[in-house]
Amino acid sequence: MTTNIVLETTMGSLILELYTTHAPKTCNNFTTLVRRGYYDNTIFHRIIPNFMVQGGDPTGTGRGGSSIFGEKFEDEIDPGLKHTGAGILSMANAGPNTNGSQFFVTLAPTPWLDGKHTIFGRVKSGMGTIKRMGLVKTGSEDRPVEEVKIVKARVVEEEEQI
């Protein structure tokens, strides 16, 4: 069974396909946080052109967020999964085994992240939205000048057509 997540953002919708076989604990964390409304009305606090779009911090600072397992949990690195191009969904971290709630989507190949960040999905639909996000004007700490927000995140139920 494939798990899909819809992120309704201020710039358009994204459908994320989660890699539940490769990163079950990470996908469980993300899906549970989505169901709890954890990501609703949070911002993408860091956007770097030709690199990535990062969100998932309820404080909006890039220093907050926690997992359903407590503050942090361990990496689930699958050597078969690589940051090969735009649209890879991966966990943001502050070093090994420091996953919480923050995530990023790549805007280009980022091979230097391989083996350091848990890849747990991909953008299934909405690459145009992600690419537009990557072009927004940013200020200090790569923070968008105008907020880019997740208005609502939801799990697509099995019977639902997407």
Curated annotation (Swiss-Prot):
InterPro entries, per database record: Cyclophilin-like_dom_sf, Cyclophilin-type_PPIase, Cyclophilin-type_PPIase_CS, Cyclophilin-type_PPIase_dom, Cyclophilin_A-like
Keywords: Isomerase, Rotamase
Keyword Hydrolase: no
GO CC annotations, alphabetized: catalytic step 2 spliceosome
GO MF annotation list: peptidyl-prolyl cis-trans isomerase activity
Alphabetical list of Gene3D superfamilies matching this protein: Cyclophilin-like
Domain PPIase cyclophilin-type intervals: 1-155
Keyword Isomerase on entry: yes
Single GO biological process annotation from the record: protein folding
Catalytic reaction annotation: [protein]-peptidylproline (omega=180) = [protein]-peptidylproline (omega=0)
Enzyme Commission numbers on file: 5.2.1.8
Family assignment from sequence similarity: Belongs to the cyclophilin-type PPIase family. PPIL1 subfamily.
Protein function: PPIases accelerate the folding of proteins. It catalyzes the cis-trans isomerization of proline imidic peptide bonds in oligopeptides.
Protein name stated in the entry: Peptidyl-prolyl cis-trans isomerase-like 1
Natural source organism: Gibberella zeae (strain ATCC MYA-4620 / CBS 123657 / FGSC 9075 / NRRL 31084 / PH-1)
Gene: CYP1
